C-alpha cells in the first residue's frame, strides 16, 4: 500500500573484524541489511565509508573487564588486611580510574561526531539528498534540471487527490511540492552506523591481556605478578571461547527543510541554467538528532566438558559457525538500535497502514523489527484535505494498544526465509535453544509464533478504516 514514509540514507563505517573472512561477511551483512519497509531508502554515494576520518581511535577507553581488574588489584597479593587509610586510597584510585575511562569515552565520541559532521559538509550530503528528491538530471528538460516525479510518487496520491491539487496550482508541480514537501523532504534522515564484532577467541585474548596488564601493576614479595589464562582447562576458558558479540552504534541526522529553504531552492535553483552552484551551496544542511548503542550476544553450546575442551580441534568448525551467526547478530543489533532511535525521536517513528478493521480484529503489518512490543501505543491518523491552503494533512482520530502475545516477529526476513525460520539453520538453532543462544540488551531472544503474520491491536473501531496510518507514541 502506498503512503507517506520517512526516507533514510544509511552509511556504515568503522566495521571492526579481525578475521578477513568474517570481514567480508560483515560488510556484506551491512550492504544487504534491509531497513524496515516502513521507510523509503534514499541512497546517495557509497554506503561503506573508508578513510582515516572513520578509523576508530587507537586510544581506547578502559573496558569494564579491565576496570574490574584494576579495582581488585590492590587486594590481590596482599596477606594482611588493609588499614583504613589504605582502603581510602584504594577507593580513591578506583574512582579516578572510572572517571578517566568515562572522560576518554566522551572525548572519543565527541571527536567521532565532529568527523561525521565534517563528512556531511565536505561531501555536501544535504545537497545530494535534495537533488535526489527533485530527480536532478545532467541535462535540462524543458526549463529545468529538476522535476516533481519522485515527490508525487512518494506523496501517495490517488487520481482524485492529484486533480484537487493541480486545479489550484499556478505552476505545474508546485501544488504537489507545497503539499508533500513538508511531509516527505523534511523527514529525510542520514544514519552513520559503526559496528564492532568480537568472537570468543578475541574476547578471551582481550581479557587475558587485561589480567596480564593488571598483574604488572601488582607485586608479591617485591616481584610483579605473572597472570596468564592460556593453558588452563577452566570452565571460564571454554566459555569465553564460545561467544560472539556485536556492538552497534547509530548516529542519526535529519535534513533541515522548511518553507524558507523550500522557497530559496525553488526561486534560486529550480529553473537555473547550471546546477554546479546548487551542488556546493552550504545553505543546505543537516542537524544531529542523537545516537543509540545496541549489543547482541551469541553463545555456542559445544556440549563439551570444560576439561575436555581443545581449542585447536573446533577452531575450524567454530569459524564456520561464526560465518553463519554474524549476519543474524548484525540484524538483531541494527534493528534494536533503530528501534531505540524511533522511541527517542517522534518524527523518526515508523508509520504503517491499518490492514484489517472489523469487530474483534484490528491489525497492521508492523512488528518486532520496528521495536513494537506488548506495551506499545499508537495514534491513528486520517488524511484530510484542507481546501484553504490546498494541502493534505494527517489528523489524529483514535488511539490503539497491542494485544498481548500477538506481535508479529518480522525480524529475520533478511535471511531470505519466513520469520519461523524453517529453512534457516541458525534460526532453527535459536528456536530449539540446544546449540546456540542469542541475547540482546533486553535478554534472551526467542523466535515468535510463526502463525502470527501481522500485529493485532485493540481499541474502538469507530472512525477507523483500512489504510489509515498508525504511528507509535511514547
Task: State where each predicted segment sits.
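Surface-exposed, polar/charged interaction patches used for macromolecular assembly or partner binding
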Residues: 1-474
